[in-house]
Curated annotation (Swiss-Prot):
Its main location: cytoplasm. This is D-ribose pyranase. Belongs to the RbsD / FucU family. RbsD subfamily. It catalyses: beta-D-ribopyranose = beta-D-ribofuranose. It comes from Shewanella pealeana (strain ATCC 700345 / ANG-SQ1). The lineage of its organism: Bacteria, Pseudomonadati, Pseudomonadota, Gammaproteobacteria, Alteromonadales.
Length: 139
C-alpha cells in the first residue's frame, strides 16, 4: 500500500506515466469529457470528493509547471477560484518554482481537455471549477 495520500490506482498510474508538458484536467461534475480521453471518475455524490481536495492530492503527487483556467471561473465562482489560487501559491512556495497561469474561454477550455492524458471528474458542483495542469519535471 502507498504511504502517500493518493490511493486511487488510476491516478497513481497516470502520475507515474506522465511526461514533461503532458496535461491533466481535474473537473467539476458537469464538464463534458471527450470520448477519446481517459476518464477517471471519482464523483460519488454532490460535492464528494470536492474539487479543492482532489487538487491538493494531485499537487502532492505530480510536479506541475502551469495551469489553464476558464476566464469565467473568477467571476462566477470567486471563492473556489481563490481557493485554487491559494493552493497553487502554496505549491509554488513549497517547491520554490513559479507556475504559469493561463486563462482561456470556457469553450476553448472544453476543447483543450481533448488534449489531456486524462480527465479526473470530481463531485464538485461549483460552476467552472475546472483546471488543466501542465506537467513539469522534478529536476
Amino acid at each position: 500500500m502507498n504511504k502517500h495520500a493518493l490511493l486511487n490506482a488510476d491516478m497513481n498510474y497516470l502520475a507515474a506515466t506522465l511526461g514533461h508538458t503532458d496535461e491533466v484536467t481535474i473537473c467539476d461534475a458537469g464538464l463534458p469529457i471527450p470520448a477519446q480521453v481517459k476518464r477517471i471518475d471519482l464523483a460519488l455524490t454532490h460535492g464528494v470528493p470536492s474539487f479543492i481536495a482532489t487538487v491538493k492530492v494531485w499537487l502532492a503527487t505530480s510536479q506541475i509547471e502551469g495551469i489553464v483556467l476558464a476566464q469565467e471561473f473568477a467571476d462566477v465562482s470567486p471563492e473556489c477560484h481563490q481557493a485554487l489560487l491559494a493552493e497553487i501559491e502554496a505549491e509554488q512556495q513549497a517547491t520554490g518554482r513559479t507556475f504559469s497561469v493561463e486563462y482561456i474561454s470556457h469553450e476553448a477550455f472544453k476543447q483543450r481537455t481533448g488534449h489531456s492524458r486524462a480527465v479526473i471528474r470530481t463531485g464538485e458542483c461549483t460552476p467552472y471549477a475546472n483546471v488543466i495542469f501542465k506537467t513539469g519535471v522534478v529536476f
